[in-house]
Amino acid sequence: MENENKILIIRVIRSFEYRTIKNLILKDIDLNTNVSDFKKLVADKIQTTPGFTPFKTKQYDSMKIFFVPHGQKPNNLTINIENDHFFLNNNKSLAENGVVYETEISFFVMEDYLKYKENPENKW
């Protein structure tokens, strides 16, 4: 049987407008993990991983698939705003949400996302 532990790339988004994004690489993640538990794990990693100091002040609450390997990358470099069906459901496992090996997942504040989606303009 195939090993269910995978590497995932988490794109922690502090600011949509300024494209303040930092990748967090997580290894040996069980894809059968519930999304709400996974969010807690990622939030803990942000608090304890060196280099994430500017990202520690936000209360990240949402996850959305940015890119699935061998799939099409979105046009927007900050977040996938075209496909709202890519949001991860808290009540399902990562695998049930379509997460596979080396999937890139955006982790962000929903309120900031909704503002950005109304006017997806970059300030810089």
From Swiss-Prot:
Native source species: Dictyostelium discoideum
PANTHER family registered for this protein in UniProt: UPF0538 FAMILY MEMBER, UPF0538 PROTEIN C2ORF76
Coiled coil: none
Identification of the protein by name: UPF0538 protein
Family: Belongs to the UPF0538 family.
